[in-house]
């Protein structure tokens, strides 16, 4: 359980005082209809394959992991203690809604699911400069090369909102449409991201209760 627990006031106070990077411009990419779009997920939950070394402790690991579309043997490699890990243990879709995307593709709601998806660690430095200038643009180029149109971005820990919002700016500037899913409305508004869905769930449960397929969609 997060040290914040379900204390909404404490979470909002933390989000309001969190240092965030500034962007001179907010890009807003128009894309094809959703039913024709290829969608990828980028999460800051630090996910990686069981066989991979994963992420280092601290705020200096800005690399990203590539997650193949059919990979389910994933480990939650985010080292923060400030979020609920039980949800992911029960249902990876609470932070990485890959099964929900597959279902939406079958139903024709989205055009296609991307072949690869990506994971960063959300606990980055206050400037998030390494992701802004290095690994973020590199990840964007990979998705563009794979013909991705839309990126769904999710987080886990209390610091993740700053990282997911930074990634949204980086991806939109590269030509990818994004939607950020975050409980920290204050951070999304201060960072002026193009699109954000505000949730009220505890850290670690970006899409709500585990195994709640209807709600997660």
Task: Annotate each predicted stretch with a short phrase.
Residues 1-217:
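Metallocofactor- and cofactor-centric catalytic cores in central/energy metabolism, strongly enriched
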